[in-house]
A protein has these predicted regions:
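Charged, low-complexity, helix-prone segments enriched in Lys/Glu/Asp/Gln
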Residues: 1, 17-18
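Divalent metal-dependent hydrolysis catalytic cores, especially in the metallo-beta-lactamase
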Residues: 2-13
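Alpha-helical recognition segments enriched in aromatics with Gly/Pro capping
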Residues: 6, 18-228
């Protein structure tokens, strides 16, 4: 419909669970991880360049402003590589945590749900899957990494930390951060119920803004510019 070139790889994070666990294993072997009652975390103090990419002032950071507070974390901005399923709960997507990834107390980890034979069930942290898939498909150093500007201080910062800590080389040569698309002057948000999909734009009364509005106004704009889209009320 839009004349866009499809990606060479259409991947799912769940297809890369063994590789994600292997990345956690590498980070553990290199001394970058530690374990709490709810998961395995990346120790950002072991990665001196952690704040450089987003020019973060870590001394002024408050845990709640960027990440969920966890009193067991060594630094508020340390992030989960692998989370343990909560006791008494079962997730739609969870996997066995390999015993060699656990600390010496292993299966006695408090606060973690156990499966058959006391195996601790878990799931990947938010950032782990992206680094894993990128390095598996594109190599340890990729040419261009894109994403939204809102990912700079947390997601992309954490991707860089875990990827470069594991590989020892630069993760991405260039970063292209896209600005936000706004609708009628406001942000697009699930909570506001104002989201529009491409399918919405292709159907019904929105066709009149599709060709000129979407292609010229969105797809052909400078990637770092904020774009506004007005939706007809009829």
């Amino acid at each position: 419909e839009f004349g866009l070139t499809p990606p060479e790889h259409m991947v799912r994070a769940t297809d890369f669970i063994p590789q994600q666990l292997a990345l956690v294993r590498t980070l553990k072997e290199k001394g970058y991880t530690y374990q709490t009652s709810d998961g395995i975390y990346f120790d950002t103090s072991k990665f001196p360049r952690y704040a450089d990419f987003a020019q973060l002032d870590l001394a002024a950071q408050k845990a709640g402003a960027r990440v969920e507070a966890n009193s067991e974390k060594r630094q508020p901005w340390d992030f989960a590589l692998w989370k343990f399923t909560e006791p008494g709960k079962r997730r739609d997507m969870e996997w066995e945590t390999p015993e060699d990834l656990l600390d010496s107390h292993g299966r006695e980890t408090p606060g973690a749900a156990s499966g058959a034979a006391g195996v601790i069930m878990g799931f990947p942290g938010w950032h782990l899957e992206c680094s894993t898939m990128a390095m598996e498909l594109l190599g340890q150093t990729i040419d261009i990494h894109t994403g939204g500007i809102d990912h700079i201080p947390v997601h992309h910062t954490n991707e860089i930390a875990q990827s470069e800590a594991a590989s020892g080389v630069q993760f991405a040569r260039y970063w292209l951060h896209c600005n936000h698309l706004k609708i009628d002057g406001g942000k697009i948000s699930k909570s506001l119920g104002n989201g529009l999909s491409v399918l919405d734009l292709l159907q019904g009364t929105l066709n009149d803004i599709l060709d000129a509005g979407l292609q010229a106004g969105v797809l052909h704009r400078i990637y770092e510019a904020q774009v506004g889209l007005s939706v007809p009320s009829h």
